[in-house]
Amino acid sequence: MSCTRMIHVLDPRPLTSSVMPVDMAMRICLAHSPPLKSFLGPYNGFQRRNFVNKLKPLKPCLSVKQEAKSQSEWKSPHNQAKKRVVFADSKGLSLTAIHVFSDLPEEPAWDLQFDLLDLNDISSSLKLHEEKNLVFDFPQPSTDYLSFRDRFQKNFVCLENCSLQDRTVTGTVKVKNVSFEKKVQVRITFDTWKTYTDVDCVYMKNVYSSSDSDTFSFAIDLPRVIPTEEKIEFCISYHANGRIFWDNNEGQNYRIVHVQWKPDGVQTQVAPKDCAFQQGPPKTEIEPTVFGSPRLASGLFPEWQSWGRVENLTSYR
């Protein structure tokens, strides 16, 4: 096909005799022939679709979970500081004062002090155990010094002091210094002299030196179980110069008896089961007075001499 025929197809209008290339290009651009529009139609639709797609917003490549946002919103109220209102006085101190009140009234300090008489009753009621129901049935020999001195001069041996504590009998014995070699023993029985035991005494150095007397000590453990019908008695023997001197408490022996404690604190001797208790003549007992006195001190602590016995305070001679 020649160029002239092509131009007639695009534009049927008449052409000049001379056709320039510019004229042909202008006709092609300005021509509205149906074949060209139909040819360019699909391309225009593709451009419009591309333009619409370019206007759409792009999706982000990172996705944020909604849970993190909800948790942050849930925690945010706690992070906020709570508002507080504090009232103060003129000096800036708090107006709040706390006072604690007790339903029970406080007792004065003087009510906490023990009454000596009540304390004595309590201690007496506690002595109901078997280990505490043994006592001496004789006064301390050194309490009456005049009698002790006479017996010492006559028998050459005499029990000086004796104590019973934790089922152990301890004491001291005074002997006359008749020879250098001496032997002092305590003969004791726990079954009314069916059997007996001789316990050696130990020499003690005299605190107050005396050339005519010596002091010995002893300690005897009592059996754990002693029948109440059996008698517990002991005496002192002194061996010197081939002779034996005895101190048997003027023939009565030194006895340890079972006693029964009563709620009022009074001690009564337990009678044997096989025979009635023979009560002897009443003995002179020391009655304790309130808050202590010379009489009470001499009864509880015989080694403490009082002004009432100042006439008896002489040496062991």
UniProtKB/Swiss-Prot annotation:
One of its GO terms (cellular component) is cytosol. This is Protein phosphatase 1 regulatory subunit 3C. A motif (PP1-binding motif) lies at residues 84-87. The lineage of its organism: Eukaryota, Metazoa, Chordata, Craniata, Vertebrata. Residues 149-257 form the CBM21 domain. Keywords: Carbohydrate metabolism, Glycogen metabolism, Ubl conjugation. Disruption phenotype: Mice display embryonic lethality when homozygous. Heterozygotes display decreased protein levels, decreased glycogen accumulation and glycogen synthase activity, reduced insulin-stimulated glycogen synthesis and progressive age-dependent glucose intolerance. When Ppp1r3c is silenced in adults, they display decreased PP1 activity and glycogen accumulation, increased phosphorylation of glycogen phosphorylase, increased GLUT1 levels, increased glucose uptake and increased glycogen degradation. GO terms for molecular function: glycogen binding; molecular adaptor activity; protein phosphatase binding. GO terms for biological process: glycogen biosynthetic process; glycogen metabolic process; protein targeting. Pfam families: CBM_21. Ubiquitinated by NHLRC1/malin in a EPM2A/laforin-dependent manner. Acts as a glycogen-targeting subunit for PP1 and regulates its activity. Activates glycogen synthase, reduces glycogen phosphorylase activity and limits glycogen breakdown. Dramatically increases basal and insulin-stimulated glycogen synthesis upon overexpression in a variety of cell types. Interacts with PPP1CC catalytic subunit of PP1 and associates with glycogen. Forms complexes with glycogen phosphorylase, glycogen synthase and phosphorylase kinase which is necessary for its regulation of PP1 activity. Also interacts with EPM2A/laforin. Residues 141-263 are annotated as: Interaction with EPM2A. It comes from Mus musculus. The N-terminal region is required for binding to PP1, the central region is required for binding to glycogen and the C-terminal region is required for binding to glycogen phosphorylase, glycogen synthase and phosphorylase kinase.
